[in-house]
């Protein structure tokens, strides 16, 4: 798993790796300010996993080309697409080079591809999900595996099976590369 933007989600993944996967999953965390991440690491985590203390734009694209089918690129970055930004690099340099079968998680994506009203009212002027929506329209290279907010809003009866998700349904989308240029 390569995670762009590290923090509490990193800790959750590391815990799941320990409890359910016998610590067999290797992580690369790309985080220019890893103080929080380092504080969350358990003894031994730093020897098994890598932390690249730099902006994702400074990471060679070849790092992402190492991902194989079933591997995960987990994106929780600035959420803003603009000149020279992390998202610009990820969407235009990294995603087109990913191999068939690579799974992509993008955090803070809501259905129907609109941010919560409260976020806009409090100055979260993100634009990531608008660009993602445009990218997905008529795109046969990417398929949607799971869209948490869509399930929560459209298939509410399914959430009855998972009552904790009703409290905090989150906002993320899981995609899969179906055809590859890389």
What name fits each language-model region?
Residues 1-7:
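Conserved class I S-adenosyl-L-methionine
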Residues 8-20:
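Conserved SAM-binding loop of SAM-dependent methyltransferases across substrates and taxa
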Residues 22-28:
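Short beta-strand element of Class I
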Residues 30-74:
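S-adenosyl-L-methionine
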Residues 66, 79-179:
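C-terminal substrate-binding/active-site "lid" region of AdoMet-derived donor-dependent transferases
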Residues 7, 33, 78, 110:
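Catalytic metal-binding/acid-base residues of hydrolase active sites
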Residues 2, 72-74, 103-105:
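Structural motif
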């Amino acid at each position: 798993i390569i995670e762009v933007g590290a923090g509490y989600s990193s800790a959750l993944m590391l815990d799941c790796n320990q409890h359910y996967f016998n610590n067999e999953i290797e992580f690369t965390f790309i985080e220019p300010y890893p103080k929080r991440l380092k504080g969350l690491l358990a003894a031994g985590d730093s020897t098994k996993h890598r932390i690249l203390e730099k902006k994702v734009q400074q990471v060679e694209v070849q790092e992402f080309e190492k991902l194989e089918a079933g591997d995960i690129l987990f994106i929780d970055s600035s959420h803003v697409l603009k000149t020279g930004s992390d998202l610009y690099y990820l969407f235009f340099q990294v995603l087109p080079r990913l191999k068939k079968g690579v799974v992509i998680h993008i955090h803070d994506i809501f259905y129907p591809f609109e941010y919560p009203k409260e976020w806009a009212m409090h100055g979260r002027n993100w634009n990531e999900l608008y660009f993602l929506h445009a990218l997905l329209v008529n795109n046969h290279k990417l398929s949607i595996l799971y869209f948490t907010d869509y399930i929560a809003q459209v298939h509410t009866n399914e959430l009855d099976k998972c009552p904790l998700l009703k409290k905090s349904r989150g906002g993320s989308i899981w995609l899969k590369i179906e055809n590859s240029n890389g």
